[in-house]
């Protein structure tokens, strides 16, 4: 497997082409951003933690018949993935009230929802990733009705699998965002699943173990990321 030219660099990852047309290499960075890029910084070893956590969780989902872009972890910071055409959407699941939904709906942080809440965001940095619904998605031709249904079904399945898995590690999966892509195999779960893209709370202390520690200047950011990896058996 030969790593070739840089295809794309985002806030948290670099994507490289390889000598195989349908395979890419993702390299995870230590750069951290919040509030749509308004806050920037670095979290030591974040790239290593996010790569290892994502690899563990993608492998778990693959075993549970959720198709993902993950092939294998190559090194501390790199993983091999299948080439996909990413939908310009973020699919968000909220099991508890936290973050923007508290401000938007006047909810107290920590409220457990009777059923999981699913939201879509339009991936657009200039517009600050506005929330949209399935009608916007179809009208703007971002995805078809059938594709939306597939992504929705996969998202709820991911939530069931991961919520149970994290509870077994004494972690509450508060909320998370997913991204999906199209490939010759159909729709695949893509991007990453990590403390960057999920809210994790300690089941017993309710301590935040995710990027909120960076967003809110709570301190011990690196320790929180490493704690997640440790509980998942990745250290």
From Swiss-Prot:
GO terms for molecular function: ATP binding; phosphoribosylaminoimidazolesuccinocarboxamide synthase activity. It comes from the Bacteria. Pathway: Purine metabolism; IMP biosynthesis via de novo pathway; 5-amino-1-(5-phospho-D-ribosyl)imidazole-4-carboxamide from 5-amino-1-(5-phospho-D-ribosyl)imidazole-4-carboxylate: step 1/2. Keywords: ATP-binding, Ligase, Nucleotide-binding, Purine biosynthesis. GO terms for biological process: 'de novo' IMP biosynthetic process; cobalamin biosynthetic process. SUPFAM superfamilies: SAICAR synthase-like. Gene3D superfamilies: ATP-grasp fold, B domain (3.30.470.20), Phosphorylase Kinase, domain 1 (3.30.200.20). Its EC number is 6.3.2.6. InterPro entries: SAICAR_synt/ADE2_N (IPR028923), SAICAR_synt_PurC (IPR033934), SAICAR_synth (IPR001636), SAICAR_synthetase (IPR050089), SAICAR_synthetase_CS (IPR018236). It catalyses: 5-amino-1-(5-phospho-D-ribosyl)imidazole-4-carboxylate + L-aspartate + ATP = (2S)-2-[5-amino-1-(5-phospho-beta-D-ribosyl)imidazole-4-carboxamido]succinate + ADP + phosphate + 2 H(+). Belongs to the SAICAR synthetase family. This is Phosphoribosylaminoimidazole-succinocarboxamide synthase. The gene is purC.
């Amino acid at each position: 497997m030969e790593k070739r030219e840089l295809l794309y660099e985002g806030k948290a990852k670099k994507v490289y082409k390889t000598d195989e047309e349908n395979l890419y290499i993702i390299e995870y960075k230590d750069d951290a951003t919040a509030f749509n890029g308004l806050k920037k910084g670095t979290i030591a070893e974040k790239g290593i933690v996010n790569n290892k956590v994502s690899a563990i969780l993608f492998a778990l989902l693959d075993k549970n018949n959720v198709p993902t872009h993950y092939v294998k972890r190559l090194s501390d910071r790199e993983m091999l993935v299948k080439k996909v055409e990413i939908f310009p959407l973020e699919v968000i699941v909220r099991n508890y009230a936290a973050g923007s939904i508290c401000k938007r709906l006047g909810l107290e942080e920590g409220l457990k929802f009777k059923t999981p809440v699913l939201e879509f965001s339009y991936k657009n940095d200039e517009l600050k990733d506005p929330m949209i619904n399935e009608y916007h998605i179809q009208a703007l031709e971002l995805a078809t009705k059938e594709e939306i249904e597939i992504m929705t079904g996969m998202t709820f399945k991911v939530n069931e699998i991961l919520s149970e898995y994290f509870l077994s590690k004494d972690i509450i999966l508060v909320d998370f965002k997913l991204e999906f892509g199209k490939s010759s195999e159909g729709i695949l779960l893509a991007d990453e699943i990590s403390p960057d893209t999920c809210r994790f709370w300690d089941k017993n202390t309710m301590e935040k173990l995710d990027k909120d520690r960076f967003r809110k200047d709570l301190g011990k950011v690196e320790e929180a990321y490493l704690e997640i990896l440790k509980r998942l058996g990745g250290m």
